[in-house]
C-alpha cells in the first residue's frame, strides 16, 4: 500500500475582492501553513473614486451629496464633518434647535451603523438568526430618516449653519416610541448573543489589542475603547450639544473581539439615552442660521451661465473660504472621522484631506491575524468594522 504524501510547503490563497465576508471590495492575500495564518497582505483601492480631488472643484454645498458616499451606512457623520469645517472657518453659529436635531440624527445614524455591523458580523461567524432581526430595527430607523429628510440613505440633510428642513409634525412622538421599543430589542440581543457559548468560543481572546498598541497604531472609536482607553470625541471636543446630556463613555479593557462587540452593544443603549433626552428638551426657534445669508454673493446672472441658479429648494449660500487651515473631527461609529481643510479665499477648498477611521483601523489587521487560524480572520475583520467606500475614498 502506498503511503499518502503530505505537502509541507506553504499555501497562498486570495480572499476577496468578491468574498461576501470582506464587507466590500477588500482583497486579502493570505499565506497559510495548514490552517495557521503565516502572513496576510491587504490590497486596497478597488473602490477609489478620488473624493479628495473632487472636493477641490466643488463648493461645499455642491460637494455634500458626494460625502454621503464615503461611509454610506452612516452618512449623517460625513455630512456633519463637511459642514462643521466651513462653519468654524466662517465663525457661523448654529441655532440651538438645529444642533439638537443634528445630535438626534447623528445618534440614530450611529445605531443604524452598529446594527448593520452586528448582523453581518454574526453571519460571518455562523449565526444567521440575528442577521434578520437587526434589519427589522434598522428599517424603523430608516423610516424615521425618510420622514425627516426624504431619503432612507444618502440624506443630504445637513446645511452650513443648520439643517435643510425642520422635523415634520408627529416625528418626535414616533422617535420616542422607537426608543422605548429598541431598548427592549437590545436586551433581546444580549440574551440571544452575549451569553451564547458558541459565540463566546469564537470571539473571546481572539484579536487582542493592548492599550499601548492601540495608541501606537492610531486606532479610534470602539477599537480604542475596547482596549481600555476611555476616549470619545463627543466628550473631548464638546461639539454640537452633547455636554447638555447625561451619558457615559462605554469601554472595555480586554481588547479582544468580544470586548469590541460589548462596546458597540453598550453604545447603542447610550445613544438611545442621548436621543430621549434631546427629544424631551428640544427647544423652539429656527432650524438654520439666517445670518449666513449675508455671506451670499448675489450677482446679475444670465440664463445658463456659470453663476446661474435654478429657482428651486433654497440652498445654503456659497461663500469664500478664508485663507487658513483647519482640522475638524467627529466621533463616527467606526472611530475618528476628520477632515483637514485649507481655504484659499475661494468658494472651492484648496485642500480637503479626509481622515477615515476605517482606513486607519484596518492597518492592524495583518498583525492581528498572524499565528491565528484561517477561520479567525472573519472574526477579527468583522470586529474591526470597515466600509470600503470610506477606506478607499
Swiss-Prot record:
Q: What is its EC number?
A: 7.1.1.-
Q: Which cysteines are joined by disulfide bonds?
A: none
* Molecular function in Gene Ontology: NAD binding; oxidoreductase activity, acting on NAD(P)H, quinone or similar compound as acceptor; quinone binding
Show the SUPFAM superfamilies listed in the entry: HydB/Nqo4-like
Q: Where in the cell is it found?
A: Plastid, Chloroplast thylakoid membrane
Membrane topology field: Peripheral membrane protein
Q: Which top-level group of life is the source organism from?
A: Eukaryota
**Is the keyword Repeat in the record?**
no
**Keyword annotations:** Chloroplast, Membrane, NAD, NADP, Plastid, Plastoquinone, Quinone, Thylakoid, Translocase, Transport
Q: Which Gene3D superfamilies would you find in this protein's record?
A: Cytochrome-c3 Hydrogenase, chain B (1.10.645.10)
Per UniProt, the enzyme's principal EC class comes to translocase
Pfam families with a match to the protein in the record: Complex1_49kDa (PF00346)
Q: Which PROSITE patterns match?
A: COMPLEX1_49K (PS00535)
GO terms for cellular component: chloroplast thylakoid membrane
> What does the entry give for GO biological process?
photosynthesis, light reaction
| Catalysis performed (reactions) | a plastoquinone + NADH + (n+1) H(+)(in) = a plastoquinol + NAD(+) + n H(+)(out); a plastoquinone + NADPH + (n+1) H(+)(in) = a plastoquinol + NADP(+) + n H(+)(out)
So what does this one do?
A: NDH shuttles electrons from NAD(P)H:plastoquinone, via FMN and iron-sulfur (Fe-S) centers, to quinones in the photosynthetic chain and possibly in a chloroplast respiratory chain. The immediate electron acceptor for the enzyme in this species is believed to be plastoquinone. Couples the redox reaction to proton translocation, and thus conserves the redox energy in a proton gradient.
PANTHER family attached here? NADH DEHYDROGENASE [UBIQUINONE] IRON-SULFUR PROTEIN 2, MITOCHONDRIAL, NADH-UBIQUINONE OXIDOREDUCTASE 49 KDA SUBUNIT
Q: Which HAMAP family match?
A: NDH1_NuoD
- Family under the similarity heading: Belongs to the complex I 49 kDa subunit family.
Q: How does it assemble?
A: NDH is composed of at least 16 different subunits, 5 of which are encoded in the nucleus.
This one is known as NAD(P)H-quinone oxidoreductase subunit H, chloroplastic
Native species of this protein?
A: Jasminum nudiflorum
Q: What is the lineage of its organism?
A: Eukaryota, Viridiplantae, Streptophyta, Embryophyta, Tracheophyta
